[in-house]
Amino acid sequence: MIRLFNDIIPIFPILMLIFSIIILFFILNNKNKVKSGCIVTTISIFFSIIYILYIKRFFFNYSSDLIRIDQYSFYFMILLLISSFFTCIFSYSWLLLEDNYSIEFYFFVLLSTIGGMLIIISNHFLSLFLGIELLFLPILGILNFFSNSRKNLFSIVNYMILSVFSSALLLLGVSFIYFVSGRLSFSFFPLIFMYYPSIILNSMMIFGICMILLSLFFKLSLFPLHTWSPNIYQYSNPCSLIFFSTAVKISIFSFLLRFLNFFPYIYKIKSIYYIIYLISMFSVFFGNIIGIIQNNVQRLIGYLSISNIGFLLIIIITQSYSFVFLNKLFIIYLFIYIFGLIGFFSIKSIIDINFIERKNNLLKENSLIGLFWYNPILGILMSIILLSLSGFPITLGFWGKFFIFKHLIQKKFFITTLLIMLSNIVGMQNYLYIIRSLYIKPIKFSNTSLVNNLYISILQKFLLISIGFLFVILGFFPYIF
């Protein structure tokens, strides 16, 4: 009984989310099913966050053949749950507009969240693949939930086909690794490489590792495997993008870190090392430079996210043998990226729903123009978020990139530092372009501004102001981390 209790403690947040899914089945025919579903989902996610924060102080490590939970896992699970929480809160107004299928959105979010948490705590290729499929299949429904656009449907179908192909590559890589090592549990690989170091140079092992990395880079939309990503960002609803743009990155990046930790000898294979290095560099350059020619704001953010993921990959690849999980540098930059995207798409979803209600769908691309003039608070919050993402001086984003440059110089990556700095200047121009549009006088039709009297709930205001407050305080005091 004690053993069973000890096994349940670490996975209790997942069990809590599963229980909330069961409750949702009982309120499918409720008259206020959207409100009830939102309450059930947000409460379960909120208490999962509280539980993890509480147990994090006493619980250190739990390991079995299928899962491994440590302080590193707790950090990523909290980020994933926060992303899900914001998605549920800011999707509520959109779901009220749906006639028939509305509460199903919460099913998708909960299932994807459970899948993401399985990826984060996976210690076996079986649990990893189960988590990946559980994460990505419901996301297809999330992306298409608030849109009937053919372009959106086409981009999702394209993403689905390519995602299936990347999952097949992952399985192919796993099969080659299993053929060479005879193991699927990650915990055994450091021992195998320690006692049989020559196995890492086996051609089938190298091919298997390359296939797995290729699959992960596709799911992270790194260059040149990014072609599906901009269309998803452009045609999907901002409310869906709160979850998609953050949850996928958190989950897959957490596994990539764990994978590189259990396969430390990858750095000895120069070909793989240089390929990862070039992919990260080209991602930073490509995302910033191609963003210049974009006219759609969401598509621009999609390209800039490629650049940000490239930054995170550079942090990892330049640490080589001294790689340490969750150092201050990685925490700061990941925090900026995740909360920046959550804040941006949360504000965008509030604005866009007013266009839907006023039947101004054709004008949604101009929804950020003049935001400051009809809602100064949202305009200022959006400016703070975008300035932080750009790395503007005296913001949290500036310190994140400053620490990256300092780290690269210490590792003697001088040319890399110079190239990234030049690329970052271009990226800053892209963010300033969006910020500039916030302060342009809003367009008027029939003497009426595009959006007047934005409705924002008290909870939504609190969450957005909290993000802005965190960015400002941590911008002045970055060493709080």
UniProtKB/Swiss-Prot annotation:
TM region(s), chain numbering: 8-28, 35-55, 76-96, 101-121, 125-145, 160-180, 198-218, 240-260, 272-292, 306-326, 331-351, 367-387, 415-435, 461-481
Reactions performed catalytically: a quinone + NADH + 5 H(+)(in) = a quinol + NAD(+) + 4 H(+)(out)
Localization of this protein: Cell membrane
Keywords: Cell membrane, Membrane, NAD, Quinone, Translocase, Transmembrane, Transmembrane helix, Transport, Ubiquinone
Pfam families the record matches: Proton_antipo_M
EC primary class: translocase
A Gene Ontology biological process term: ATP synthesis coupled electron transport
Membrane topology of the entry: Multi-pass membrane protein
GO CC, any one term: plasma membrane
EC number from the UniProt entry: 7.1.1.-
GO molecular function, one term: quinone binding
Family statement drawn from the similarity comment of this UniProt entry: Belongs to the complex I subunit 2 family.
Subunit details: NDH-1 is composed of 13 different subunits. Subunits NuoA, H, J, K, L, M, N constitute the membrane sector of the complex.
Function: NDH-1 shuttles electrons from NADH, via FMN and iron-sulfur (Fe-S) centers, to quinones in the respiratory chain. The immediate electron acceptor for the enzyme in this species is believed to be ubiquinone. Couples the redox reaction to proton translocation (for every two electrons transferred, four hydrogen ions are translocated across the cytoplasmic membrane), and thus conserves the redox energy in a proton gradient.
HAMAP family recorded: NDH1_NuoN_1 (MF_00445)
Protein name per Swiss-Prot or TrEMBL: NADH-quinone oxidoreductase subunit N
